[in-house]
C-alpha cells in the first residue's frame, strides 16, 4: 500500500507494529507453543484450573463458581463458562451493551461488567465458538428460572415442548419446558433455545 501511495512510511510502520502485537496475542494462553508439555495449574488470573475439564471434558459444579464469568444476580445476565486462557473475544465484541469484559489481553477470562445492563439479545451466546455462554434469568417466574443456550441440532424444538434438562456432565437434572427458539441471520446459523427450569 505504501509503494502505491495509499499510506506513508510512518503509517505503514505503525500498522505493522500493531499487527505484530495482535499476532503475538494470538500465540499466548495455556495452549501456547511455549506451554507445550507444561502442567498448568492456575489461570493467568491465579484461579485453579478446572481439572475435570481437562480429564473428563466438562467443568464440575464445584469448580465453575470460582471463575469471573459466573455471576449471580437478579434479571437476565450472561453466564460464561470460559475457564481457560485462550485467545478469544467475540463475546465482548458482540455485546451491544458492553456487558462482557475481557480487557486488553485477549487471553484474559471474560467477566460480567456489573455496571452494564444486559438486554437478553443473545448475541454473546451465538458468537461464542466454544458454546460456553448462556443467558440466565434466575427470577424469570415464581419458582422458575430461564436458561438460553446455543442450539445447533435439527429438528428444532417448539415452544411448549417438554423434556429433561441435563447438566454439564450429561446427567439428568430436572424437567424443562421450551419457552422460545430464536433464529436470526445475526446468529450465524446458531439458534437460541430458551428453557424454563425450577429455580432450585
Give each language-model segment a name.
Residues 140-149:
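Short, structured beta-strand/loop micro-motifs enriched in basic residues and often containing a Trp
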Residues 1-2, 89-107, 123-139:
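Iron-sulfur cluster-binding cysteine motifs and their immediate structural context
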Amino acid at each position: 500500500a505504501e509503494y502505491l501511495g495509499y499510506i506513508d512510511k510512518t503509517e505503514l510502520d505503525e500498522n505493522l507494529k500493531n499487527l505484530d502485537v495482535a499476532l503475538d496475542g494470538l500465540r499466548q494462553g495455556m495452549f501456547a507453543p511455549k506451554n507445550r508439555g507444561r502442567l498448568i495449574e492456575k489461570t493467568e488470573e491465579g484461579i485453579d484450573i478446572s481439572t475435570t475439564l481437562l480429564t473428563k471434558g466438562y467443568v464440575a459444579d464445584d469448580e465453575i463458581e470460582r471463575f469471573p464469568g459466573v455471576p449471580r444476580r437478579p434479571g437476565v445476565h450472561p453466564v460464561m463458562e470460559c475457564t481457560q486462557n485462550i485467545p478469544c473475544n467475540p463475546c465482548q465484541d458482540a455485546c451491544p451493551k458492553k456487558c462482557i469484559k475481557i480487557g486488553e489481553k485477549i487471553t484474559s477470562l471474560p467477566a460480567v461488567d456489573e455496571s452494564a445492563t444486559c438486554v437478553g439479545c443473545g448475541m454473546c451466546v451465538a458468537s461464542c465458538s466454544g458454546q460456553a455462554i448462556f443467558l440466565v434469568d434466575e427470577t424469570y417466574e415464581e419458582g422458575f428460572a430461564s436458561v438460553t443456550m446455543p442450539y445447533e441440532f435439527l429438528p428444532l424444538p417448539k415452544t411448549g415442548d417438554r423434556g429433561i434438562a441435563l447438566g454439564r456432565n450429561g446427567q439428568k437434572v430436572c424437567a424443562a419446558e421450551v419457552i422460545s427458539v430464536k433464529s436470526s441471520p445475526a446468529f450465524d446459523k446458531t439458534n437460541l433455545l430458551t428453557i424454563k427450569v425450577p429455580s432450585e
